[in-house]
């Protein structure tokens, strides 16, 4: 999607809005972490003889505390081979080569950004991998962005009619349809176009939604409406993905399934290192490298 021309200027209460957004992202993080630990506790199928996983939280500072920071929450368990739920609130100045790529940064390089980012790589190949991210960015303008997308790792499950994909898309569609500022068909198409491996001519997964540069006119609710939609994306994800995990996590799998999973994870690595804007943004703005690259799966295979 082509980047729009966003209005310049910040509202008088921008500090309040920044604080509200930051608090929401951190609250959502805590909710998801608690729900994922409950899933670890409830496993009854393969590997249930192993200890249930628990998140390990690690706080980090950007620029020795002069540019904000965040919290990495990582877990390696018997359901989730690797899952990271991260929040960050950072500020500073964009480097010269990056300013023209960000709305409002060419006029003034200063920025503020807060958000939550999640990636889950389950043990069981029947459970799809997932990614979710929502954020608020402030330059001389301000906007929201984010989305959620599902990546089944078995070819027989990578079809639009698979029950997991149908359920996931329906949850995102309902979240969008509650809000005038959201456009489900547009955001779904945007996701399909964004999460695409051009060099392999194939999608990363079975899609979801993706949006960016969301700054709506006051006539349809402005910042408050955009924030309400962004919250609903997070809430919808926090309900639908645990449901998908619980539907599949006790199912048996074969060594062939595991091999197929590891090859599909290789595609995930290729996308994140070659195309992902969030990865590039984080590395170019002095983000926490360990946190940024934690989205990569723990084990992969290239045939």
UniProtKB/Swiss-Prot annotation:
One of its GO terms (cellular component) is cytoplasm. It catalyses: coproporphyrinogen III + O2 + 2 H(+) = protoporphyrinogen IX + 2 CO2 + 2 H2O. It holds the Pfam family Coprogen_oxidas. A divalent metal cation binds at residues 121, 131, 169, 199. The active site is at residue 131. Substrate binds at residues 117, 133-135, 286-288. The record marks 199 as: Important for dimerization. Its main location: cytoplasm. It is found in: Cytoplasm. The keyword Magnesium does not apply. Its cofactor is a divalent metal cation. It comes from the Bacteria. It is an enzyme of class 1 (oxidoreductase). Its EC number is 1.3.3.3. Belongs to the aerobic coproporphyrinogen-III oxidase family. This is Oxygen-dependent coproporphyrinogen-III oxidase. It comes from Sinorhizobium medicae (strain WSM419).
